[in-house]
Amino acid sequence: MIEFVYPHTHLVAGVDEVGRGPLVGAVVTAAVILDPARPIVGLNDSKKLSEKRRLSLYDEIKEKALSWSLGRAEAHEIDELNILHATMLAMQRAVAGLHIAPEYVLIDGNRCPELPVPSMAVVKGDSRVAEISAASILAKVTRDAEMAALDIVFPQYGFAQHKGYPTAFHLEKLAQYGATAHHRRSFAPVKRALGLVS
């Protein structure tokens, strides 16, 4: 990881999101406070890890972290608020769910939600800050599992493969079968499938 200079505080939470780009399902966030006495080897951006390694780290993070929490904003909230505001809301929910209050929050990306504690956005934080990497892994494994579950209910869309992202296959099936109740109606490809835009 590129060296990151931590704020002078003890209880640092890392926050990341997964699922801003997909056309279906929730945006899922996680907040993690790691335990310095129980280091976790191999934390890295969850997108760069194999699925097997991610699943192994997911269990280890949940076991060793001082506190962890998941947050989410559902498809209907994304449609009501827009994806940016829904993501900020989901991040607030993840931080609020921590059973230990952090002294400082580090958030992946370039903007922070309003929080009751000091926070800082860290560009490429998922590959620079261990707490954000851990949050990224929890959020991704959780959302991927939700897409696999949705795939069982709607096998024709291939959600387990593309995780709801707008792949050519997903767009083809959206045009063929229309949108499910889980699709984000404010996203242009879904609007087109519903005949809401030409």
Curated annotation (Swiss-Prot):
It catalyses: Endonucleolytic cleavage to 5'-phosphomonoester. This is Ribonuclease HII. Residues 10-198 form the RNase H type-2 domain. It is an enzyme of class 3 (hydrolase). Endonuclease that specifically degrades the RNA of RNA-DNA hybrids. CDD domains: RNase_HII_bacteria_HII_like (cd07182). The keyword rRNA-binding does not apply. Belongs to the RNase HII family. Manganese or magnesium. Binds 1 divalent metal ion per monomer in the absence of substrate. May bind a second metal ion after substrate binding.
